[in-house]
A protein has these predicted regions:
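One-carbon transfer enzymes
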Residues: 5-249
């Protein structure tokens, strides 16, 4: 048994110790976990995750920039991930997805309540047995019952530093406020809109010469970069969720 990499963090405020260890060699999972349980204090949390490619399902509406970036990186090696399917509530992005020989499924929200539509979406997702669900500009507010089916497994990209500019037309809101930086936040989804544990953030500087459309173009670049960087860390099993925050080791 060989330790390839080991990273640790102590949160002195809460008295919590976090550790991520990469192992290689021949060992019995059950025996290793039993040995850990006997060595660790009562109440400790441990996971043993096998190496290998993770499966994701991507949810979309109409915007293509984040989806297109993930498709390109998955196809050409920028992300070691299997995209099992892309599911949308509109047909808009079907042609883009099918160019990469990935299944696109339409689960329309028309004629359904939020709860009904979320149940249909959840069933479509679960049919692919993904490790994670990625919201690539999926513009529907998820119900608590949907979120509960995928705890700490749903990753969203938000168009600002949270909780600023919640909702529609964020870059027009930013323009009206005369902001000097715009950014994006990738986070896990919880029951509170755009308030889940933050995984990754970034900003770019803008000035008074930027129109709302200029901000939108620049913001889309930040969004897709932040989402792919966050997903890279999640897929590598580097992200620990504790309370409403993350530790990345």
């Amino acid at each position: 048994l060989n330790i390839v990499q080991n990273n640790e963090f102590v949160d002195h405020r809460t008295g919590r110790f976090f550790m991520r260890t990469e192992l290689e060699g021949i060992f019995n999972d059950t025996t290793l976990l039993a040995d850990l349980d006997s060595a660790l204090p009562e109440g400790s949390v441990r996971e043993l995750n096998p190496a290998g490619r993770r499966r994701i399902v991507i949810l979309v509406t109409k915007e293509a920039h984040c989806l297109g970036d993930l498709l390109m990186k998955a196809n050409y090696g920028g992300l070691d991930v299997e995209i099992a399917a892309v599911i949308g509530n509109h047909e808009t992005l079907r042609t883009l997805v099918e160019r990469f020989d990935i299944p696109f499924e339409l689960v329309s929200h028309e004629g359904h309540t939020r709860e009904e539509h979320d149940n249909l979406m959840a069933a479509a997702i679960e049919a692919h047995n993904p490790d994670y669900v990625v919201l690539a500009k999926y513009m529907r507010v998820l119900t608590p019952s949907f979120v509960a089916r995928f705890p700490n497994k749903i990753i969203n990209i938000h168009h600002s530093f949270l909780p600023a500019f919640i909702g529609a037309r964020p870059y027009h809101q930013a323009y009206e406020r005369g902001v000097k930086i715009i950014g994006a936040t990738a986070h896990y989804v919880n029951d509170n809109l755009d308030e889940g544990p933050i995984i990754m953030q970034d900003v770019i500087h803008v000035d008074h010469t930027y129109t709302a459309e200029d901000m939108m173009r620049a913001g889309r670049d930040v969004e897709k970069n932040v989402l792919s960087r966050a997903l890279y860390q999640v897929l590598a099993q580097r992200v620990f969720v504790y309370g409403n925050r993350t530790i990345i080791l």
